């Protein structure tokens, strides 16, 4: 019998059983006694054998394929994880990082969740068709970097709509009337939200987007560079929009390299605004104007949300969106 089956038999949530097994506050004495009695009667391991001197939290990094977003995005996700683990440690928890492949069948089935009190899911690469699999997690969990629309999960992520608005508002303020879209070809929830926001705010700020101005690029600097060169070789210079918004900095930087390789001046011939503010964006030449999102804040908020859920079984599931700010550098200019 596992913790989920035990909880169903008693008529409480797995989170409530976990609280009792770990001798933590947040459950009434009556409920605590009922659960302990059921544990003894069922033969399930007694609470005293499950009590841990240090409260363990599982950091579950979910990776799809090569992990273009979690492994190759210049430490964006890594900074979130570091901030989350540091905050958990400060609160007296012991976080353990585990990497799982999303394309592995039954990837959650062999995880010993009973060793942990809660799970923080690094959900950057989890696709919509995979959202429901997280229902298998029998203990409290918080999803990070994916708002999981349609699911009643606690989540902490990026306010993609507002952050895209910030970027396009600046493009309009600079005087641009037409904008291109360097769209990620990678299927991720964050990118889907940015796509919807891009077209919504392009219309709001009267920025023309031609059908051919949407260019799908891989979220890898080298691949985006090669793909953008192919695009430029098939288009005349006067056909290229004077400004582009990119789904993330990796794509923007790859495209910028391709523009320079094909003798475009940035921002004189073409301007670019990115999204994420990864470290290289500040030191490349020209430096990249981009929307900065605090990775540290996302991590800290996720850790605090996890802690609050564990301390209070009545804690409501919360979805928290983190806004950003524009970092103006030299890849954009006032347009004539």
Role assignments for model-derived ranges:
Residues 1-54:
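N-terminal helix-turn-helix DNA-binding module of bacterial transcription factors
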Residues 13, 45, 117, 176-178, ...:
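Short acidic/polar active-site loop segments enriched in Thr and Asp
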Residues 38, 83-87, 133, 193-205, ...:
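Alpha-helical structural signal in soluble globular domains
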Residues 56-169, 173, 233, 250:
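Alpha-helical recognition/docking segments in bacterial nutrient-uptake
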Residues 60-63, 122, 144, 181-182, ...:
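Short hydrophobic segments within beta-strands
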Residues 62, 66-76, 97-104, 156-166, ...:
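Hinge/beta->alpha junction and helix N-cap segments in small-molecule ligand-binding domains
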Residues 233-336:
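Flexible loop/turn connectors
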């Amino acid at each position: 019998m596992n913790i989920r089956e035990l909880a169903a038999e008693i008529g409480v949530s797995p989170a409530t059983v976990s609280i009792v097994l770990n001798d933590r506050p947040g459950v009434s004495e009556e409920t605590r006694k009922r659960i302990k009695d059921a544990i003894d009667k069922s033969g399930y391991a007694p609470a005293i054998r499950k009590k841990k001197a240090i409260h363990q939290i599982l950091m579950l990094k979910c990776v799809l394929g090569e992990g273009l977003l979690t492994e190759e995005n210049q430490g964006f996700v890594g900074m979130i994880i570091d901030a989350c683990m540091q905050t958990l440690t400060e609160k007296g928890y012991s976080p353990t990082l585990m990497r799982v492949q999303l394309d592995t069948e039954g990837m959650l089935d062999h995880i010993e969740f009973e060793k942990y009190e809660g799970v923080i899911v690094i959900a950057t690469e989890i696709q919509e068709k995979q959202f429901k699999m997280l229902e298998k997690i029998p203990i409290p969990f918080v999803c990070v970097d994916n708002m999981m629309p349609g699911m009643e999960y606690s989540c902490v992520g990026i306010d993609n709509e507002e952050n895209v608005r910030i970027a396009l508002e600046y493009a309009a303020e600079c005087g641009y009337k037409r904008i291109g879209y360097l769209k990620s070809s990678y299927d991720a929830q964050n990118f889907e939200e940015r796509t919807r926001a891009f077209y919504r705010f392009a219309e709001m700020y009267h920025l023309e987007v031609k059908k051919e101005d949407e260019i799908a690029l891989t979220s890898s600097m080298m691949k985006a560079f090669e793909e953008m060169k192919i695009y430029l070789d098939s288009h005349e210079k006067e056909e290229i929009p004077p400004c582009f918004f990119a789904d993330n900095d990796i794509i923007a930087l790859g495209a910028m390299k391709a523009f320079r390789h094909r003798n475009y001046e940035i921002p004189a011939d073409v301007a670019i605004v990115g999204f994420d503010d990864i470290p290289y964006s500040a030191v490349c030449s020209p430096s990249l104007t981009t929307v900065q999102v605090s990775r540290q804040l996302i991590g800290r908020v996720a850790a605090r949300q996890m802690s609050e859920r564990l301390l209070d079984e009545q804690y409501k599931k919360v979805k928290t969106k983190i806004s950003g700010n524009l970092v103006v550098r030299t890849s954009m200019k006032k347009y004539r």
